[in-house]
Amino acid sequence: MIGNWNYGTGRRKSSVARVFIKKGSGQITVNGKPVEQYFGRQTSIMIVKQPLFLTNNVEAFDIKVNVHGGGESGQAGAVRHGVTRALIDYDAALKSELSRAGFVTRDAREVERKKVGLHGARRRKQFSKR
């Protein structure tokens, strides 16, 4: 499959996306489904297409994505990161433009773990004076 395809791996929260792009008509498939069908929310679809809009390549590439782990928001962010890396693999001149927009940098924020004796990561038990 890697013949004339360009590849990029994207990660966000606990999601991992493998993105393959090649010159085409602008079709985006995520796990075998059209992007509009896979991501229900319009904001998630917009996040996925952001690097394409920025580089004026909305209908220039066919994109195939395998994504797993996490929820809808994390998966959309992972796909955006993967599309960005695949575009850089296709044309390194796009890197500065994508980097200025902040798409090249991996968002390192993860869920903080729950601690013993607390309700959540930071939420303490209610204090009673008496």
UniProtKB/Swiss-Prot annotation:
Pfam families for the chain: Ribosomal_S9 (PF00380)
Keywords: Ribonucleoprotein, Ribosomal protein
GO cellular component, as recorded: cytosolic small ribosomal subunit
The keyword Ribosomal protein is assigned to this record: yes
Biological process according to GO: translation
Similarity section: Belongs to the universal ribosomal protein uS9 family.
HAMAP family: Ribosomal_uS9_B
Entry protein name: Small ribosomal subunit protein uS9
Lineage summary: Bacteria, Pseudomonadati, Pseudomonadota, Betaproteobacteria, Burkholderiales
Gene responsible for this protein: rpsI
